[in-house]
């Protein structure tokens, strides 16, 4: 990797990815919804005000990068939300909102920056194991599961279409990570830190090849079923 765009870098996993890549000498562009002041203070290039639910916003990001002559060697799309719901009390506005962020977010963002991808570039889209059809043994979490299952399809489609340009795409499950996103997650779980998840996801993208493109991988390195 050399020039890396990290989307959703305000906090959590993407924040840690940005810092770890910067610390090892990569040229990191951190796309943040807010100002990303602490990342900027650390010497990381910050693109503030990037809203993945807005076509205008992500196209403006791509235009700014293009005007600066930026070419991307890797993209980590991490921005996402998780609101829990159950059958009998489904909020369809909430479902639409999660799809807007978790599914259409990576679709519109990667489509916008696609012309900036170098041949041989790598794209990592953070989804979730709960979006796996084969792994769903408990039900519930309707809107989150739906949005992440669809995000997996977004990534698989990008694999097929971008491979023609020499770009590899990986779907990423970070594991059970202790962030604001998971604080209300049901059940007892053994959590890892955002720093641990980031290190695993970076390693996955480092090791990504055209032969492993289009797969779904845990931050611990294991490949997951769809």
Curated annotation (Swiss-Prot):
InterPro entries, A to Z: NAD(P)-bd_dom_sf, SDR_enzymes, SDR_fam
Enzyme Commission numbers on file: 1.1.1.398
Coiled-coil blocks: none
Keywords (A to Z) from UniProt: NAD, Oxidoreductase, Plasmid
Superkingdom classification of source: Bacteria
GO molecular function annotations of the record: oxidoreductase activity, acting on the CH-OH group of donors, NAD or NADP as acceptor
Comment on pH dependence: Optimum pH is 9.0-10.
Top class in the EC scheme: oxidoreductase
Catalytic function, reaction form: 2-glutathionyl-2-methylbut-3-en-1-ol + 2 NAD(+) + H2O = 2-glutathionyl-2-methylbut-3-enoate + 2 NADH + 3 H(+); 2-glutathionyl-2-methylbut-3-en-1-ol + NAD(+) = 2-glutathionyl-2-methylbut-3-enal + NADH + H(+); 2-glutathionyl-2-methylbut-3-enal + NAD(+) + H2O = 2-glutathionyl-2-methylbut-3-enoate + NADH + 2 H(+)
Family: Belongs to the short-chain dehydrogenases/reductases (SDR) family.
Function recorded in the entry: Involved in isoprene degradation. Catalyzes the two-step NAD(+)-dependent oxidation of 2-glutathionyl-2-methylbut-3-en-1-ol (HGMB) to 2-glutathionyl-2-methylbut-3-enoate (GMBA).
Protein name per UniProt: 1-hydroxy-2-glutathionyl-2-methyl-3-butene dehydrogenase
Species of provenance: Rhodococcus sp. (strain AD45)
